[in-house]
Amino acid sequence: MYSLEISLRYSPFPLSIQKKEYEDIKRIYDEIKDSMNSDNQNSPLIELSCEKVQDKLITVLAKEVISVQIYEKSAVAGGSKRPGFSLDI
């Protein structure tokens, strides 16, 4: 299972989705990255769906995305910390 995590401007918590195939998550990553690079004033909406939680849908404005990352979600349970964008309270 692969996770895509997005950080939004003025939001302390990331949004994430999961996909089973790396190619699927990489395609979404590239789409978001291309939207971030464009100088289009009418920022497109990016709609994301999750394979782990079937009814989970997220729509964000591309211009509000400040970072995006992909990581493989390990099947190993335990106290390991997930990579990037974690908030330690």
Swiss-Prot record:
InterPro entries: UPF0367 (IPR020885)
Family matches, as HAMAP family: UPF0367 (MF_01360)
Family listed: Belongs to the UPF0367 family.
NCBIfam families from the UniProt entry: PRK13683.1
UniProt-recorded name of the protein: UPF0367 protein PMM0124
